[in-house]
Amino acid sequence: MYLRRAVSKTLALPLRAPPNPAPLGKDASLRRMSSNRFPGSSGSNMIYYLVVGVTVSAGGYYAYKTVTSDQAKHTEHKTNLKEKTKAEIHPFQGEKENVAETEKASSEAPEELIVEAEVVDAEESPSATVVVIKEASACPGHVEAAPETTAVSAETGPEVTDAAARETTEVNPETTPEVTNAALDEAVTIDNDKDTTKNETSDEYAELEEENSPAESESSAGDDLQEEASVGSEAASAQG
């Protein structure tokens, strides 16, 4: 309010001046030309200076604040862009690390499975051999029932085992002894199965022959005795 009154007074002073000013002296023009003061009293001039100074300072302060705020916004925008780029780059690096870890785990898993499978096979092979031995010991009666079939199977057995051993050695020359023993056990089981089947068939044929002709049974018994004698002589010669 004080500034408003001062401004109104300074603007109203020229209007209130008389239309016909008082006559001046001869040197009045020189005084006016030499003086640098604004028209009006000294108090009104001071108020004018204050108003102008305040307006200029306010304008300068406003300009300074706008410039500094623009700079601050610009710097914040730059920092936000940098943070966004970093946030976009770091997830890709994390994904690459996760992919590398999964690949390592997948490469290690098959090796562990292979080692476990080998251990399981090595543990199961002794039990399989024990079962085969029990089956072979459980059927001695069938072997005694038909000497002809046993002789044939005895002749063919070593050949089959030798062939199986050769095949295993040719296919896998660098395999472990456990694998070769497993192959030999399988060959022995095959031979035993063949022996049992042949023994059963020979028993059936013998029953049929006995029912049909007793004479043929006697001749076959003689032939069996001759074959047993020949087998015994061969065994004695081999031992000698």
Curated annotation (Swiss-Prot):
Coiled coil: none
Record-linked Pfam families: AIF-MLS
Record's bilayer topology term: Single-pass type IV membrane protein
Compartment list: Mitochondrion; Mitochondrion outer membrane; Mitochondrion inner membrane
Compositional bias annotation for Low complexity: 170-181, 228-240
Cytoplasmic side: 1-40
Residue ranges, compositional bias (Acidic residues): 202-213
Membrane side Mitochondrial intermembrane: residue ranges: 64-240
Chief localisation class: mitochondrion
Cellular component, GO, one term: axon cytoplasm
Region: Disordered, residue numbers: 166-240
Annotated tissue distribution: Expressed in the brain, adrenal gland and corneal endothelium (CE). Expressed in steroid-producing cells of the ovary and testis (at protein level). Expressed in steroid-producing cells of the ovary and testis. Weakly expressed in placenta. Expressed in corneal endothelial cells.
TM ranges: 41-63
Cited PANTHER family: PROTEIN MGARP
Purpose of the protein: Plays a role in the trafficking of mitochondria along microtubules. Regulates the kinesin-mediated axonal transport of mitochondria to nerve terminals along microtubules during hypoxia. Participates in the translocation of TRAK2/GRIF1 from the cytoplasm to the mitochondrion. Also plays a role in steroidogenesis through maintenance of mitochondrial abundance and morphology. Plays an inhibitory role during neocortex development by regulating mitochondrial morphology, distribution and motility in neocortical neurons.
Name this protein carries in UniProt: Protein MGARP
Organism, scientific name: Homo sapiens (Human)
